[in-house]
From Swiss-Prot:
Residues 1341-1354, 1366-1376 have a biased composition (Gly residues). Zn(2+) binds at C56, C69, H72. GO terms for biological process: DNA-templated transcription. Residues 1333-1484 are annotated as: Disordered. Its EC number is 2.7.7.6. It comes from the Eukaryota. This is DNA-directed RNA polymerase I subunit RPA1. Mg(2+) binds at D597, D599, D601. The gene is TRP11. Component of the RNA polymerase I (Pol I) complex consisting of at least 13 subunits. Residues 1464-1478 have a biased composition (Basic and acidic residues).
Length: 1744
């Protein structure tokens, strides 16, 4: 710091001279610098005169100093201990460095307070040191293995992670450990040179940064957690406390006594600490800076070895200069403290907003104000030390109050320093911070922005720029004497100046000595002429002259629309400047690339500022070149709307043009290109007319053919009588099918079919660029795969495709102007309106007879609506197609869809909200205009009206609601998808294809050994297997890509293929071509054609390809007469197959080499864009698709966030395929379906809903609402002064329990134990909700302990003891890792009571009538208050006026009696022998399990006033308490809960939640739901496991018990939607495959190339675990701290980089952009060289 800051500021803000604040303030004969001292930079603030930097003036030549001075640092010194002494500057107090405060606190907690070593044993310290040594040598695996296998001194790690391999030596001594590591290092270093070893270590260290950081964190955590006496000196260290950044230490009294006894402390020291603490009113002792410095110095001196590895680069300067030096390891402790605070340079602080008030006082900025506050505390502390220095033994100027104030000042000084540094760090963080706002998003000068407009007459790769924008932008062009014309143009621009077009803004002169001079041309014209004459003469004498001219026609610019979601959103264009234009104009064909709709959108234009960049824009970024989108490898550019409609109108079979119109259309289309093709005239392009008499007429198909033939490089040679070779040949389908021409007359139900011509035109066929049949609809003119423009792109290149689009656009627009296209009301009317109304009435009533369920009614309504739509649109339209322009637009794909036509003419249809119909309100209505519980389709949002007929107010309301819901969904989805794409961009930005075809990240780690598995570029490989295109166009494909031969069809007598002719010239070749051919042959041998492609080609040629097997029908007749027809046809086909197979294989091999992804390609960015751009189209919310195999599965953006952002799945599902199941297998599956679903305790309750004792339904309803009766339980509350007693009586059904027992495959005793454990868990959950008790303390007696149980209960009990009641599943459910959560699905049992049974009759019924309104009777089912009226919520009763509450809550005996203890009723026939639970009675006399005779269970909790008793109520006890006529299937279990008197809760909600969450423990793994979804094939389907416990381990364990010998259940094909579960159970490769499959399912409909998805999946799993694309996953593993700081949590990454002294080699994109470095990608990943020796060496090595 002393090397960059030499101006000490000693004057607080506000104390400077108001007239000259930069002048030093004189105090005691010393000059004290102010915060505005000019030695820290230029001072320029109104109303003061500007002052130059004195530091620059002293070091630079000239009296004016440096006008561009950025300033110099000053500093604020910490308090001097002896202010008046000569060495006061070197003896200062220190404060803790805020950046390293956290690390210092950890070290203080880990060290011994007395011997200043780590308290942990030496072996533990050496263990971590050797692990770091291995990591630094590039051996992270060995380092982690060392920590796993070598235990600590106490053997903790060995017990938890016992992974020692067989015959591995035991390391338990420091010397053995050191020799063990040395041996590993020697083994790894053997066999390689020293240079290779260093290179290997350097490369490995970059990829192991995260492992090293993990080891450092583990080491510090372990050393800090070591408790007890020091292992070296046996002293006991204090406890450190940190409050507000201040550290205190505190000794326990017992520890003080021990340390004093051992001599580590004296009583005097302790007394001094206690006196100071009493003075400040605290218990801890302040740990001041001098004490911290002393302790840290000794720690670094004694633990230098381990600390040097924990902080390896700490103290190293980021940039080495002459004044910088490396801090030795023994002095690195000084970096944890600060003795001075840097003051930012003066210009930086002045630019932050310095203001001057009316009194002339400078109002400082935030940083200056904070530094001034620090300086104020420094002055106060120095005053204290001055008084202390002047004090003597006989006379002291220091009082206790002053000492207290001084300590307070010291603490405040530390806090102010922390706040100052925190403000600096916060300026980096978040979106508005310096990293993301300023350093990542750079402002560019040569750019403009304006509104865009479409222009069909401009070229597709041209942009029309308004002249004002062209004058505002400039391009630097160097003047060269070898181009006189260009030199004269630049001289003319200089003379015109910046205001006249074409002109120039300024010129730049670069001399040979490196001097650069800039001359502004905003001067008078005469001066500009002089500049032009003088400087252009200098250009001829060796001076480099650069003219910054205006943008001219032909310049290249980058056109961009935000948001830039993918690569085509930023493309290169050729400029054409227009004087009258006010907006930026470009062709329609580019709208889809930018997602621009010309409704006021604005776009950006960037002008490249170098010749190299301009060349890259022209050759790599040109709009024509970006015809295919990297997301899918399919076309993204295409004509839209009016052009498509015109294409259909032009290509109708009855469309003809006369000569003048046809020639005019042809000239408009290809006129701009005729001059470029020498030798082709307009007359040669006109074909023979289709109709000769009575006058020549040409068809629209001929017009299209002329455009395609011209783009294919062919002329109209069809009249020359010779056969045409070349031109595109394709066979595709049209979007207009023959059904569009069908009509259904009024009053009829039979459709009148289309004519044969319409059927023929439904197939688009080109032969040698001649359109034979078909309509030019969206499939041919739009952005469609394998369309005519796509064929032109693949065969003739991108620029021919651009010409074709431009010609199509001009021709079709001019033709449409002649034809016209408008929409009339007749186009929306139907023929048979009465039938429409009748069918819609039937649709409205169709849901009346079906259950009111979404899954039943909605599909039925949708199917019927679809049938109506198919009948009416387009068959029953008043104006038929193609005269109906509404149908013309929707069917051809020009605008809208069939749904829009249906809504305009027929009906609006069903309105959906998140995929569901509108729901009913609390009034059981969907809208006030409908009836209660109405089930008609209209009431659920089906709009019967159309836009032509009008809609009703209710339909309008629901339609508006659905539109609003969609807008909200879009708004939320935009932010979610934007964050998703940003995370993907950051996580994948550094993935680049390297020279060896591998994909590596910035760390050098290999992500993929071959990009995408095959190394092919998605755009280049999109048509690699388009065999039909290659076969039909083999001549042109061979011309473009080369090959040994291509097909040549000659007219042989038998019509067979005449053979193959050579396409290459075998004469003398130039050297360049020879080298290229040699390189191609070498590459073909290195990368041969894969067998899969060869097999695919053979299958196509043998099974799918069509060949002309004959030319004359007479030939067939002759073969048939000789009975050789089949044989001859097969022979001819085999000849064609043989002729094509070798040729196409050779071409495909060459095309595959050409399609390999180029080194330097940023495939990571392309993959992130491919996944991020379609995510904007995904639905946001979770939805359930009808018929889906896995229901309730998160889809869309939430699912993507689970997979990529969080790497955690909320609702996992395991799918197991089933194929060809037999009847026996079906029985096993049915058994599994019953046994696999988790049984809930609420399924066993007898839910009584009828009134008892002849009571009315109303009274029964009141009872249900008040007491929970009807839910299967009853509760009662008794409140007293000392506590509250809650009695919950559960009514269970024996038959339901027995059915569950059979379903769960358990013995009677096991199931009874499961039942009691479930009861205990329910009580735990209730008590936890009431008292917030985290876990049960202990059981009151032996009866509450259920003991062991078959099926692994001991293991379950151990897990329960370890996990507590949070496991939810009890001691058995916890075995399978289940957690307490709401179960989604379950099986509800019947009520379990016959109609003749009743509860509470007789005595209970008579007592109900005598109850008072204040609830004086408090007995429940166990007593006689069956219908006792309580408050509305039934949760808490008042203790006042209740004669039973106080005594009941206070009397423990009464509390025990309320539980209905069986011990009290043993004489009533119970089979219980005692309370110890030694004999549970087995089963009852009826052979059913005795669920009602278990011993009472006592439970106590951590709070003494909380407890519970669970006991069954015997039949005799129930009868004695008033419960009569209890059905023999039912029994009652009482749970009496004792809580504090101040507990307030809604008892029904608490009990309901506990019952719903509790499952019956089972020895079998259990799941939330288990379904079998059948497929179309008989006996085939899928087993789907969902809910808690749906893991692969549980599913496999469950299936292994049922599938022995069953082959139909494919266990090896089981798959889980939880990627981590798959990776843990099967291995990380299985996790990768599962993640890839999940991504493929999500992006399948968006045609995302599999290579992108595989790269994303590989990036997420390549480190052996499933990592997210967030700061806790992929981002955290990067070795670039600058890259991490630009993502999120800047403070965290900055602290780690500073504390660990991490460096950044700028390999990542973000780090390179931050510092202005060119990212090493694309053309920047290679270096161009003109050295002929290098070229000769390459040629000799590869082609000699």
């Amino acid at each position: 710091m002393s090397g960059i800051a030499f101006v000490e500021v000693r004057t607080r803000a506000g104390q400077e001279d108001r007239s000259a604040p930069w002048r030093p303030v004189v105090r005691n004969g010393e000059n004290h610098a102010t915060f505005y001292d000019t030695r820290m930079g230029n001072f320029d603030a109104n109303p003061f005169p500007p002052q130059t930097c004195q530091t620059c003036a002293a070091s630079l030549t000239g009296k004016y100093g440096n006008e561009r001075c950025h300033g110099h640092f000053g500093f604020v010194g910490m308090p001097r201990i002896r202010p008046g002494s000569a060495h006061s500057d070197s003896d200062r107090l220190v404060v803790l460095n805020p950046h390293l405060a956290m690390d210092a606190d950890r070290l203080f907690r880990a060290k011994c307070f007395f011997c200043h070593k780590f308290r942990a044993p030496t072996f533990d310290v050496e263990r971590f040191r050797q692990a770091l040594v291995l990591a630094d040598h590039g051996l992270p695996g060995d380092a982690l293995h060392l920590l796993d296998t070598v235990p600590t001194a106490k053997g903790h790690d060995a017990m938890l992670n016992h992974r020692r391999m067989a015959n591995e030596e035991i390391v338990n001594d420091v010397s053995i450990l050191q020799s063990y590591v040395d041996r590993i290092l020697r083994q790894r270093a053997s066999g390689c040179s020293e240079e290779d070893a260093k290179a290997r270590v350097t490369m490995a260290q970059k990829g192991t940064v995260d492992v090293r950081n993990d080891i450092c964190n583990m080491a510090i955590s372990h050393l800090r957690s070591f408790s007890g006496p020091c292992s070296h000196c046996t002293a006991i260290s204090p406890t450190f406390l940190k409050r507000g950044g201040i550290i205190f230490f505190l000794f326990r009294k017992s520890n003080l006594v021990t340390n004093i006894a051992k001599g580590f402390l004296t009583q005097q020291e302790v007394s001094e600490w206690e006196a100071v603490n009493r003075l400040h009113g605290r218990t801890g002792t302040y740990f001041d800076g001098r004490q911290m410095l002393f302790h840290m110095k000794n720690l670094f001196a004694k633990e230098q070895a381990i600390l040097g590895l924990l902080y390896p680069n700490l103290g190293e300067p980021s940039v080495f200069t002459k004044t910088n030096k490396v801090v030795p390891a023994s002095e690195r402790y000084k970096l944890f403290f600060l003795d001075r605070i840097l003051v930012p340079p003066l210009p930086l602080r002045l630019s932050s907003g310095v203001r001057v008030n009316d009194n002339g006082l400078i109002i400082p900025d935030e940083q200056t104000r904070a530094l001034s506050d620090i300086l104020g505390f420094v002055e106060q502390i120095e005053c204290f030390h001055t008084l202390s220095a002047n004090s003597t033994n006989g006379r002291s100027f220091i009082t206790d109050a002053q000492r207290a104030v001084n300590e307070s000042n010291l603490r405040n000084l530390q806090q102010k320093v922390d706040e100052f540094y925190a403000e600096i760090v916060n300026s980096f963080a978040k979106k508005e911070g310096l990293f993301r706002m300023n350093m990542m998003g750079k402002r560019v000068n040569q750019a403009c922005r304006s509104v865009i407009s479409p222009d069909p007459f401009v070229e597709p790769n041209e942009v029309l720029l308004p002249r004002p924008l062209a004058r505002a932008l400039s391009f630097p062009e160097q003047v060269t004497c070898f181009a006189p014309a260009r030199m004269n143009l630049l001289k003319h621009c200089v003379v015109n100046g910046p205001r006249k077009y074409p002109g120039a803004t300024h010129i730049e002169l670069r001399h040979a000595n490196g001097e650069i001079r800039s001359v502004d041309l905003n001067v008078p014209e005469q001066t500009r002429r002089q500049h032009a004459a003088r400087f252009f003469a200098m250009a001829q004498s060796g001076v480099t002259l650069i003219v910054y001219r205006h943008i001219l026609n032909g310049d290249r610019v980058i056109f961009n629309r935000q948001p830039t979601l993918h690569k085509p959103s930023m493309m290169g264009y050729r400029v054409k400047v227009l004087s009258g234009s006010k907006t930026i104009r470009f062709h329609y064909v580019n709208g889809n690339s930018f997602n621009a709709d010309f409704d006021g959108d604005e776009m950006n234009v960037h002008v490249p500022q170098s010749i190299e960049t301009r060349a890259e824009v022209e050759t790599l970024m040109d709009a024509n070149i970006n015809y295919l989108v990297p997301t899918s490898g399919r076309p993204i550019r295409g004509l839209i709307q009016d052009h498509v409609a015109a294409g259909v109108l032009v290509t109708l079979r009855d469309k003809f043009f006369d000569h003048s119109t046809f020639v005019q259309l042809v000239y408009n289309g290809v006129g701009p290109y005729i001059q470029e093709n020498v030798g082709i005239t307009l007359a040669e392009l006109i074909p023979i007319p289709a109709i000769l008499m009575p006058r020549p007429m040409w068809t629209g198909k001929q017009l299209i053919s002329v455009m395609v033939r011209f783009s294919s490089g062919l002329s109209a040679a069809s009249d020359c009588g010779r056969e045409i070779e070349g031109g595109i040949t394709l066979k595709g389908t049209s979007q207009i099918q023959p059904s569009a021409f069908d009509r259904i007359p009024a009053g009829s139900c039979d459709a009148v079919r289309a004519k044969s011509g319409a059927v023929v035109d439904s197939t688009v066929m080109f032969a040698n660029s001649e359109l034979i049949t078909g309509f030019m609809c969206k499939k041919q003119l739009g952005a469609s795969n394998m369309s005519a423009p796509h064929h032109v792109y693949e065969l003739y290149g991108p620029h021919r495709t651009g010409q074709l689009f431009a010609a199509f656009g001009r021709v079709l627009l001019l033709a449409l102007r002649k034809e016209g296209l408008s929409l009339a009301m007749d186009d929306m009317f139907l023929v048979d309106e009465e039938r429409r109304c009748d069918l819609l009435r039937k649709l409205d009533d169709i849901a009346l007879d079906v259950p009111d369920e979404e899954a039943t009614a909605a599909p039925m309504i949708a199917d019927y609506a679809t049938k109506i739509q198919q009948e009416f649109v387009p068959q029953r339209m008043l104006v038929p197609f193609p005269k109906n322009h509404l149908l013309l637009m929707t069917i051809s794909g020009a605008k809208g869809s069939n749904l829009n036509a249906t809504q305009m003419s027929l009906q609006l249809g069903q309105q959906l909200f998140d995929g569901l119909r509108v729901k009913r309100m609390n009034s059981s209505k969907t809208l006030p205009s409908f009836f209660t519980n109405e089930k008609r389709a209209r009431s659920f949002g089906f709009a019967m009206g159309s836009f032509a007929s009008g809609i009703r107010p209710a339909e309008y309301t629901i339609h508006a609601m659905a539109g609003r819901d969609g807008l909200i969904d879009t708004a939320v989805k935009t932010s979610r998808s934007g964050h998703l794409q940003r995370c993907l961009i950051k996580g994948l930005e550094s993935l680049v294809v390297h020279w060896d075809r591998t994909v590596r990240d910035s760390n050098g780690s290999v992500i993929q050994f071959m990009y995408g598995g095959d190394g092919l570029d998605p755009c280049k490989a999109s048509t690699l297997t388009a065999w039909e295109m290659m076969k039909d166009n083999v001549v042109d494909v061979s011309k473009r890509f080369g090959g040994d031969a291509s097909e040549s069809v000659a007219g042989a007598e038998d019509g067979a293929a005449a053979g193959l002719k050579e396409m290459r010239n075998e004469d003398g070749k130039p050297t360049t071509e020879a080298v290229q051919n040699a390189h191609m042959e070498q590459q073909l041998s290195t990368y041969p054609l894969p067998a899969s492609l060869d097999k695919s080609l053979s299958e196509y040629l043998c099974k799918k390809a069509d060949f002309p097997l004959f030319r004359k029908v007479s030939t067939l007749a002759r073969w048939d007469a000789k009975q050789q027809l089949k044989e001859r046809l097969q022979q001819r086909r085999q000849k064609w197959v043989g002729a094509f197979e070798k040729t196409l294989a050779d071409i495909t091999a060459r095309r595959r080499l050409w399609a390999l992804c180029e080194p330097g390609e940023p495939v990571g960015l392309l993959a992130a864009q491919a996944a991020g751009e379609p995510s904007t189209q995904m639905t946001l919310n979770t939805f359930h698709t009808a018929g889906s195999t896995v229901s309730h599965v998160t889809e869309g953006i939430p699912r993507l966030r689970e997979l990529l952002i969080y790497a955690s799945v909320n609702k996992a599902a395991v799918v197991v395929p089933v194929t060809n199941a037999t009847e026996e297998d079906e029985k096993v599956i049915a058994k599994m379906l019953r046994a696999g679903v988790a049984a809930k305790l609420t399924d066993c309750l007898a839910k009584v809903t009828d009134g008892a004792g002849g009571q009315s339904a109303s009274s029964s309803m009141q009872r249900n609402l008040n007491t929970g009766f009807g839910k299967g339980y009853h509760y009662h509350v008794a409140r007293g002064r000392t506590g509250m007693v809650i009695t919950v009586s559960f009514l269970f059904s024996r038959s339901c329990l027995e059915e569950l027992r059979k379903r769960m495959c358990m013995s009677p005793s096991e199931h009874r134990q499961s039942f009691t454990e479930a009861l205990k868990n329910v009580v735990r959950l209730i008590m936890r909700s009431l008292s917030a008790v985290p876990r049960e303390k202990e059981s009151g007696d032996g009866s509450g302990n259920t003991g062991g149980m078959k099926g692994g209960s001991g293991r379950a009990d151990r897990k329960r003891k370890r996990s507590g009641p949070d496991d939810g599943g009890g001691p058995l459910g916890g075995t399978f890792g289940d957690e307490i959560m709401r179960i989604e699905e379950g099986t509800d049992s019947d009520d379990g009571m016959s109609e003749r049974s009743s509860i509470g009759g007789g005595r209970a019924g008579s007592e109900v009538s005598s109850l008072h309104s204040d609830g004086t009777d408090t007995r429940g089912i166990a007593g006689s208050d069956t219908g006792g009226p309580q408050r509305r919520r039934g949760s808490v009763e008042s203790g006042r006026g209740d004669d039973a509450s106080d005594s009941e809550a206070a009397d423990p005996d009464l509390y025990a009696r309320r539980s209905g203890s069986p011990a009290r009723d043993a004489e009533d026939g119970g089979e219980m022998q005692d309370r110890d639970g030694t004999d549970w009675g087995g089963t009852s006399m009826q052979g059913v399990v005795g669920y009602d005779n278990f011993p009472e269970i006592h439970m106590s909790f951590t709070k003494s006033n909380f407890g519970a008793v669970i006991a069954p109520l015997s039949t005799a006890a129930a009868a004695r308490d008033g419960v009569v006529q209890l059905h023999e299937d039912f029994f009652i279990v009482n749970a009496v809960l004792r809580t504090a008197s101040d507990v307030i809760a809604v008892i029904p909600d608490v009990v309901d939640n506990a019952l719903e969450a509790q499952r019956m423990p089972s020895w079998l793994p259990q799941f939330g739901s288990l379904t079998f979804t059948r497929l179309k094939d008989k006996g085939s389907g899928q087993l789907v496991f969902q809910g808690p416990g749906s893991t692969m381990r549980n599913v496999m364990s469950f299936l292994s018990l049922f599938t022995v010998g069953i082959k139909s259940i494919k266990l090896h094909q089981a798959c889980s939607t939880d990627i981590r579960d798959m990776g843990t159970y099967f291995g990380i490769e299985s996790g990768y495959a599962a993640l890839y499959d999940e991504l493929n399912k999500l992006f399948n409909r968006y045609n995302v190339d599999p290579r992108h998805l595989s790269l994303i999946a590989d990036t997420s799993t390549h480190r052996g675990r499933w990592e997210n694309f967030n700061f806790t996953g992929v981002i955290s593993t990067s070795a670039s701290p600058l890259f991490q700081m630009t993502f999120a949590s800047s403070k965290r990454w900055l602290h780690r980089a500073v504390s660990r002294g991490m460096s950044d080699d700028l390999e990542s994109f973000s780090s390179a952009i931050m510092v202005g470095e060119r990212p090493r990608v694309g053309t920047a990943s290679v270096r161009l060289s003109t050295d002929t020796a290098i070229l000769r060496d390459v040629l000799e090595r590869n082609f000699a």
